[in-house]
Amino acid sequence: SLGDNQLTSVENAVLAPSFESLSRTAAIGKDVNHVLVLFGGTDPSGLALSSLRALEDIGFTGKVSCVRGLGASQIEGDFKLDLEMLRDVKNMGALMVSADLALSSAGRTITELLSIGVPTICLAQNQKELTHTHATKSNGVINLGLGSLISKADLAAAIAGLIKDSALRAELNAAALAATAKRSNAQIVKRIFDFLGF
């Protein structure tokens, strides 16, 4: 916790109720067959497009699901990927459970991915996201820093490296599950009420 009036950390992140009943991914396969690309409601830095181009550059042949927020511009262009573009996803948790790896910014989505155990590469959208303390390797995330400063070649190398390294993906999965093992909305509400003296 930070100060006397705040509850912080992954353990205190309230998630959509649908995440409370999802199976947590306990086993990581040798291969990556499905990559999830999600960069928030507006994606002001164009990180989804950068991620898709990097996946294309490494010749990724599995399925790619790119989720665009309602405020994000349409991504135009042809991609040499098995790509589905999604908008206004009703059950994000169910989609996340099917992913072997995710590319995301450092907002709440990271905590959702951690709660399921999805190994994640993080690209921060802005300076504020760089201050988020939950997007760390100890929580199951490879944080590349400010996305706008990452070259396409470096992003492609990071993705290719994680795809090839099943041991690292298993380590990230275990770290994510451990970091969120005690997290539940009911426990968070209880802590808030205890904190307020109810």
Language model region names:
Residues I110-A157:
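Catalytic binding pocket for nucleotide-activated donors in carbohydrate/polymer assembly enzymes
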Residues L168-K182:
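A short, well-ordered alpha-helix in the C-terminal region of glycosyltransferases
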Residues S1-S45, G69:
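A nucleotide-sugar donor-handling region in carbohydrate enzymes
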Residues K90-A94, T109, D154:
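Short acidic active-site motifs
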Residues V97-R108:
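Acidic donor-binding loop of glycosyltransferase active sites
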Residues A181-F198:
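C-terminal alpha-helical cap of glycosyltransferases
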Residues T8, S65, E84-L86, L101-L103, ...:
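Hydrophobic/aromatic beta-strand patches that form the interior of the parallel beta-sheet core
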Residues G29-A99:
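Donor-nucleotide binding loops and adjacent catalytic segments primarily
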